[in-house]
Amino acid sequence: PDKDGKDESKLAGDYLTAALRKNFDDLKKNHISDYQHYFNRVNLSLAASTYSDIPLDERLKRYTEGAKDPALEVLYFQFGRYLLISSSRPGGIPANLQGIWNHHVRPPWSSNFTTNINAEMNYWMVETANLSELHTPLLDLIQRLAITGKETTQNFYHAPGWTVHHNTDIWATTNPMSGSPSWANWPLGGAWLCQHLWEH
């Protein structure tokens, strides 16, 4: 982002100025319309809940003890869709480790994209959950990784093609990370990420 020539201060100021011109009711109405455009595409019903009057933590406890609660499974499915709708939009960055809910100045794992499973898991349901266009931030990142990863592959392995190691970030870094050699030097993130291109 700091290499693309945009003035982030001006962009943020323009967004804030535009938002301040709207009243709360208009902002809420726009938000609901925008959100429902994605959310209302899917309705999943497995069974009526017999536990809907029980607090969620108790339902989860009962579920882990073997109680059947298909409505809880539906709730989790829709919660996963909510998270992706809220954190991955065309033209933006992909959903990352902490997402938009991070409250740290320096978040755990830098809120990066861990390519040995975490980044992929965020998007496992995107196509089957009828949210295909929310896949595009990850697909755009993969295209950028193919460019930076080509240089990494040449520099580290003297080989053709491209790679991304265990972690990447909004700058599409692909080189090995510091940390335990058991994961820091893992060069197969690109291969795994390419499954998302195929699914899309």
Over which residues does each language-model region extend?
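Acidic/polar, glycine-enriched structural segments that form the non-catalytic walls/loops
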Residues: 1-113, 131-136, 142-152
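Helix-terminus loop motifs that line ligand-binding clefts
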Residues: 88-117, 124-195, 199
